[in-house]
């Protein structure tokens, strides 16, 4: 079960995440399109993104690979109004309870979802994160792939402190939108090592390809990350 603050946060940010032009140069898009070119599917490909906002990434995939069925599963129904293509099926739902049969999708995508799967406490949060990965494993067809993009913090101490400080702020209520400080934000970041370890346990290390790059943060983001150092990690997981 997710903390109530998660929906409140993303309801606040619907307009921000619906702005056009955010995904054309996304490294993850290149990774997915490269996979599709090499795979050479001869049938329609069933692609699903969890937390896809108004569907901009899915639309970019469709432009380059029109022979696909697209599903966007979102916890925020307001995104339905901003959907960028009528060819994208919008489903109100959660990665924790997706409601689809085993092996439904050829490709599954999640971007910066895992650190928002916050429960009522830290233990439940870790359970939610693992459960989401297990659901991805269940939903992907044999021969398919899972693409995970996640912002990580490279200090295990910082990840834990950020969680508890952000949880505390939901009680205190400090809200500075210009500095991306919200009373509705609780985050539980992975380190890149811990993310790879848990994915290896679930999917098998030999099935995972990892790309990572350091993220240069503006000073206020660096402070919010407690100077732990941030990375963008992209995992391609084959089944």
Task: Show which residues each predicted segment covers.
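Core SAM-dependent methyltransferase catalytic element
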Residues: 202-204, 219-239
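Short catalytic micro-motifs in class I SAM-dependent methyltransferases
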Residues: 112-116
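Class I SAM-dependent methyltransferase SAM/SAH-binding core
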Residues: 48-50, 54-97
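Short, flexible/disordered intra-domain loops and linkers
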Residues: 119-129
């Amino acid at each position: 079960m997710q903390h109530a603050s998660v929906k409140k946060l993303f309801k606040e940010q619907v307009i921000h995440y619906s702005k056009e032009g955010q995904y054309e140069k996304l490294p993850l898009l290149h990774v997915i399109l490269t996979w599709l070119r090499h795979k050479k599917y001869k049938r329609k490909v069933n692609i699903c993104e969890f937390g896809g906002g108004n569907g901009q990434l899915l639309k970019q995939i469709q432009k380059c690979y029109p022979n696909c069925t697209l599903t966007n599963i979102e916890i925020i129904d307001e995104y339905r109004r901003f959907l960028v293509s009528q060819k994208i099926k919008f489903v109100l739902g959660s990665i924790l309870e997706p409601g689809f049969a085993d092996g439904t999708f050829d490709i599954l995508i999640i971007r910066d979802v895992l650190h928002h799967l916050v429960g009522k406490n830290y233990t439940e949060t870790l359970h939610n994160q693992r459960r989401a990965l297990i659901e991805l494993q269940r939903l992907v067809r044999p021969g398919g792939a899972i693409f995970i993009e996640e912002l990580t913090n490279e200090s295990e101490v910082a990840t834990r402190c950020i969680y508890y400080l952000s949880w505390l702020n939901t009680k205190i209520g400090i809200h500075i939108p210009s500095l991306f400080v919200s009373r509705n934000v609780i985050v539980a970041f992975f380190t890149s090592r811990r993310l790879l370890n848990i994915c290896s346990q679930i999917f098998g290390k030999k099935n995972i390809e990892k790309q990572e790059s350091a993220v240069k943060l503006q000073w206020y983001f660096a402070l919010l990350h407690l100077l732990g150092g941030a990375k963008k990690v992209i995992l391609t997981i084959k089944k």
